[in-house]
């Protein structure tokens, strides 16, 4: 297993980690990406390499006359990235190596066809890659891109112009899009995770006042007055 050193590049919108194997750039990813650990693990298995992280890299021996120099492709990548961020470069001329599934690599190759200063939707990329119904999978493949900026996944946005999902953060994505096409600043909107709405307390139901109908007691039938007794007969007819 070959040991590969990771080099750092400070861009105006975040730190990038760069690495190469046999003269080909295999890593250009954001140091703060939440997917970085998974990306390094995937590349290690696919390319049979062991990454030496910047934090664990051995300190150069000061007695050495010639300290270790980065590979030419790393030097070239840093130079071209500097030109890109200064607005003096629109495309990259760097040998690179992809490491993914056939579907992922089809998506990444489609990303390379997006012109500088343009943006497309995830549905467009899925269709371009030959999988028009796999929009969600295409979005995930963009997230697995290990060569950010070089392979411009930042040019893919939501169908509603929303800046959804990016390894370097939405701020970096907006920065890159504004850098490439300042006149398109207004249409883009940043989609943030809206806090869940607190359930509104149910208002107590209004008590319906029942009209009580007073029942008037039925009138007792009046007692019949005793009739007058006829006078007793005296026997005379």
Show which residues each predicted segment covers.
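Phospho-regulated, low-complexity intrinsically disordered regions of nuclear gene-regulatory
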Residues: 162-198
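Basic nucleic-acid-binding alpha-helical/helix-turn surface characteristic of O6-alkylguanine DNA
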Residues: 1-132, 183-237
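Short glycine/serine-rich loop segments
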Residues: 133-175
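A short, terminal or domain-edge coil/loop segment
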Residues: 118-127, 148-154, 178
């Amino acid at each position: 297993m070959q040991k590969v050193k990771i080099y750092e590049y400070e861009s105006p919108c975040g730190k990038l980690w760069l690495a190469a194997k046999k003269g080909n750039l295999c890593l250009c990813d954001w140091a703060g990406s939440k997917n970085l650990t998974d990306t390094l693990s995937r590349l290690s298995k696919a390319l049979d390499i062991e990454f030496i992280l910047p934090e664990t890299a051995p300190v150069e021996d000061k007695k050495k006359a010639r300290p270790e120099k980065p590979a030419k492709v790393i030097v070239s990548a840093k130079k071209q990235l500097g030109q890109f961020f200064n607005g003096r470069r629109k495309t990259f001329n760097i040998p690179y190596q992809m490491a993914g599934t056939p579907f992922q690599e089809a998506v990444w190759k489609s990303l390379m066809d997006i012109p500088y200063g343009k943006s497309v939707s995830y549905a467009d990329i899925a269709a371009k890659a030959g999988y028009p119904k796999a929009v969600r999978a295409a979005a995930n493949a963009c997230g697995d891109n290990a060569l950010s900026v070089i392979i411009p996944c930042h040019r893919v946005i939501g169908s509603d112009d929303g800046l959804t999902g990016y390894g370097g953060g939405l701020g970096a994505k907006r920065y890159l899009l504004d850098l490439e096409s300042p006149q398109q600043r207004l249409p883009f909107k940043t989609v943030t995770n809206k806090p869940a709405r607190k359930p509104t307390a149910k208002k107590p139901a209004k008590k319906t006042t029942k009209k009580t109908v007073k029942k008037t007691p039925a009138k007792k039938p009046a007692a019949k007055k005793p009739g007058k007794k006829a006078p007793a007969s005296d026997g005379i007819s």
